[in-house]
Amino acid sequence: MKLAFLVHTSRDYEEVIEMINQLTKQGDHVFIMINDNDLRDKVAFVYTDYLRVHVSRTQEYAQEGDLSLARGTIIQMKEAIEKDDFDYFINLTDGMMPLKSRSEIVAFLSEHEGKDFYYDATADYDQVVLNKKSKKYYPFTNALDFPRNNFLRSLSKASGSFFSMLGIRRKSEE
């Protein structure tokens, strides 16, 4: 069974390297989006010749609270499908590692073949904080240059906070 781990991180160098090494140790692939430019370059350099590590370059940055993380994950999946035929994608957020061994993960996925699994983070996360972040309106995140342009990212955060103070929020049906 071919597994692809989709990761978004802004951790320090040692943690990122250790995570990648652990995830690729048993032959799995890692598609990683790193928010820090210097860290991204260091990791890309270290794994230049390692075919199982793919540092995201199409979208290099994702901001919490807007759709750039969802878009980045979809781009990672698209790039993964173009490289190989993966059976499952496992999405990990910053600092996460699988608690089960690869054989236990494969056995579980084989037993429940064709089903999707997800973890509802709202059970462990302060609902007020989550609602505040999800309702904040961040402009410019659909701009093609958003992931690479520090000015646009900063302007988006500042505008989001300003709009929030004015009571302008993202509309949601839920």
Predicted segments with their positions:
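ER/Golgi luminal nucleotide-sugar-dependent glycosyltransferases, focusing on the catalytic module
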Residues: M1-E174
